[in-house]
């Protein structure tokens, strides 16, 4: 997906940018970028591949080359960025998070007759950050340009711009799908995707942008340049999976939400009389663990770690672009604790079940290690739709998703007309899907969190949360 961090101060901000960006490394492993601005020497920039080397290690050698009182940086799973852009609006730097689904149409509509040459990428696609900048440059000022770009883009656009004056312009997506937060400390202000990133640097919470809000940030403060809109559709997956445990979005902590989510899952199973007799409740590392702790606390079953993830030399497994590599990384990281597996009845909670490839290997791994029973629970509902609003690593087709493939196997095209029923584990079709997946993977039982339970755990009004990947309503 990606994340960003920026800061403006009366003193040098190089280390703040370096560590602030590094604290977003859980959001991507393809590219990292840093850009610092000095009033005398102008912009300094470095972009590196971080596919095989972490951001911090890759950029440490560049730190002596950077100096300045303002800067932005990013972790990107797509484009090389931040970019430097020269236009009638002046020279500025830009970094973005989001996705542009109608890139070709926009190029044809606005740029085909104007001789605009876009930077070629190895994927053959246009750099979406460059396209966003080109749309911004069609207007007479940055604010109007940002609003124009967000209106034209099908998908989402959240961004930071660093101007020649050393000011940061921050803009949250039109419906606030991703967070943008401002921190402050003496003589400095920062802007970040993850709130904990600036807490570790001595900043305190100052402000959270509303949907479509545009804010100017300087060393001495911040001001709204364009007001927030009323509609919000923040991504629910920030709490269930992508967000780091220490972060807060809309005032709701990620780790606390995950505990609450697990508790609600257990509560609902108990009320249905569906809670199995198990020796332990366990979580699939990392983000499945707090959901499992909440489940264990409410169910009264002991929590344990039947396998432990070896992390010192393995990156987060969903990030490598190649699915085969991703699966191999996931497999190599899992180290069993035989004493907690052999002859045991285990209930595992995972943050989600997407394609199911790694899950199959996890179950095989547990049975090979001597587990007697493996009950699986997903901390979110069945994923029925690939995200079209953010650049998640979820595959190229809805049929890459385990739930959709299973529906297709059961009823063919007819089943696609009944996805809402299949997503409800208490319905006849939902029960049929659960049984089929259980048989396919060898689960003793399978359960998904309900959409109502998930929204209860988040605690926001349901019309403020994007649930597209579960029910097709964004």
Give the ranges of each region predicted by the language model.
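Conserved short alpha-helical segments that host acidic/polar catalytic motifs at enzyme active sites
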Residues: 1-210, 216-279, 284, 373
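Flexible loop/turn segments at secondary-structure boundaries
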Residues: 12-14, 102, 168, 177-178, ...
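PRPP-dependent phosphoribosyltransferase catalytic core
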Residues: 150, 165-167, 172, 202-208, ...
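Phosphate/diphosphate-binding loops
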Residues: 197, 204, 209-213, 267-273, ...
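Long, K/E/R/D-enriched contiguous segments that form extended
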Residues: 271, 276-315
């Amino acid at each position: 997906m990606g994340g960003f961090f920026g800061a403006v101060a009366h003193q040098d901000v190089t280390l703040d940018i370096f560590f602030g960006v590094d604290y977003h490394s859980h959001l991507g492993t393809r590219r990292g970028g840093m850009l610092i601005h000095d009033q005398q020497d102008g912009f300094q920039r470095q972009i590196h591949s971080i596919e095989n080397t972490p951001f911090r290690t890759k950029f440490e050698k560049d730190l002596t080359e950077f100096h300045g009182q303002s800067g932005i940086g990013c972790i990107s799973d797509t484009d090389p960025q931040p970019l430097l852009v020269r236009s009638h609006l002046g020279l500025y730097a830009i970094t973005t998070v989001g996705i542009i689904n109608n890139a070709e149409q926009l190029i044809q509509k606005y740029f085909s007759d104007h001789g605009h040459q876009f930077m070629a990428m190895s994927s053959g696609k246009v750099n979406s950050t460059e396209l966003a900048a080109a749309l911004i440059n069609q207007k007479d000022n940055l604010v109007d340009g940002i609003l124009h770009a967000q209106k034209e883009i099908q998908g989402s656009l959240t961004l930071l711009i660093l101007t020649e004056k050393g000011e940061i312009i921050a803009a949250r997506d039109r419906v606030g799908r991703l967070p943008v937060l401002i921190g402050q400390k003496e003589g400095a202000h920062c802007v970040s995707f993850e709130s904990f990133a600036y807490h570790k640097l001595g900043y305190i919470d100052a402000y959270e942008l509303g949907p479509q809000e545009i804010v100017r940030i300087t060393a001495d403060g911040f001001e709204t340049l364009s007001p927030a809109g009323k509609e919000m559709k923040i991504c629910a997956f920030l709490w269930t999976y992508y967000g780091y445990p220490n972060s807060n979005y809309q005032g709701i902590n990620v780790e606390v939400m995950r505990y609450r989510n697990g508790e609600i899952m257990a509560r609902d199973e108990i009320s249905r009389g569906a809670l199995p007799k198990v020796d332990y409740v366990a979580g699939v590392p990392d983000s499945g663990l707090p959901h499992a702790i909440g489940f264990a606390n409410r169910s009264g079953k002991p929590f344990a770690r039947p396998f432990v993830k070896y992390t010192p030399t393995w990156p987060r497994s969903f990030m490598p672009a190649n699915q085969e590599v991703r699966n191999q990384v996931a497999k190599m990281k899992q180290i069993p604790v035989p004493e907690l597996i052999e002859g045991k009845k285990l209930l595992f909670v995972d943050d989600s079940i997407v394609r199911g490839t790694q899950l199959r290997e996890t179950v095989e791994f547990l049975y090979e290690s001597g587990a007697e029973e493996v009950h699986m629970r997903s901390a979110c509902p069945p994923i029925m739709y690939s995200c079209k609003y953010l650049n998640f690593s979820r595959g190229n087709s809805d049929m890459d998703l385990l739930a959709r493939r299973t529906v297709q196997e059961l009823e063919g095209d007819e089943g696609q007309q009944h996805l809402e029923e299949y997503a409800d584990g208490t319905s006849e079709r939902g029960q049929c899907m659960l049984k089929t997946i259980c048989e396919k993977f060898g689960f003793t039982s399978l359960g998904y969190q309900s959409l109502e339970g998930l929204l209860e755990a988040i605690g926001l009004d349901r019309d403020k949360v994007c649930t597209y990947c579960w029910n097709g309503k964004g």
